[in-house]
Amino acid sequence: MPRRDDLKKVVILGSGPIRIGQAAEFDFSGSQACRALRADGYEVVLVNSNPATIQNDPEMADRIYIEPLLPEVVKRIMELEKPDALLAGMGGQTALNIAAALAHDGSLDELGVELIGCNLTAIDEAEDRDLFKKVCEEIDLPVCKAIACDSIEQVLASVDELGGFPLLIRPAFTLGGLGGGTAYNTGELVEIASQGILHSAIGQVLIEESILGWQEHEYEVMRDGADNAIIVCTMEN
């Protein structure tokens, strides 16, 4: 993000406790964000629920709130601090969910707080399984056959259309695949999909055809504002 002279105070959301899908790398990235913004003259307010982190050291931010990472708590802090912007991209899935919730319910507009780093459209398109599938299709990127569902009735209706079992259940807006899994029969499908809908922040699961037996190759790519890109690591599963 280029320097913005119209912004004076920024709230940064931490990632909370270390757990599967959201580990120490977010403490490191959050710490670097605090340092970079303060070095550039911004007033930094950090909200994090985990006191045992580097970013909670007193010199990291102008003010630090060790509070539960919940939308209503973050809103109360912003009402008190009156920041110009909210930075959620350094806090992992938890922070992105909070930012999306505050944007969708109108809280950010009400408080005059701008979401910086990741905009709302990018968060929705990356986390909403149906929107992500449509984005991939629009750019002619091959994807597995899948159907977005928000009820068990829709889940059961998707079985024949997707060619039968096994099927993969992918909840939207969850951390580390929480509530997802592979179903080999109707009973497993209902059980897993019910949990997925329950855990999803928007009550949605994507029912996807299985590609068991395929190899997975993952590339971590960093890209800057000038569209320069570099592959920093590769993985094979």
Regions found by a protein language model. Name each.
Residues 1-237:
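N-terminal beta-alpha lobe that positions the nucleotide/phosphoryl donor
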